[in-house]
Amino acid sequence: MIVCVLDDLLFSVKISTAAKQMGADVYFERTPGMAAARIKEKQPSLAIFDLNSARLDPLGVVAELKSDPETRGIRTLGFVSHVHTETIAAARAAGIDEVLARSAFAERLGEILKE
């Protein structure tokens, strides 16, 4: 199971379509303030974050997950516009496992969902 924390419709459709084709189980959390609780509840193998989402506070959620013994082992991956170098640095400081440019994420989506 993969939990996606994003509110970008384009990427939601891309992920849903790829997951359906591969038979991957994906859950989308779009409710502000609920992402960390949902990830803790679902215990996914991967949590994917749109680091450009101001509404869903992905950096705060990643920091919360990585500071909790119950969730710190969950693999986290974020995608972000490559020009937002401060966001990339902040995500790494929060403890995210991997950060990809939006284009690289879209290109590697099938591979990411298989892992």
Place the predicted regions along the sequence by residue.
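Conserved acidic segment of CheY-like receiver
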Residues: 1-9
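Acidic, metal-coordinating helix/loop segments flanking the phosphotransfer/catalytic sites
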Residues: 31-46
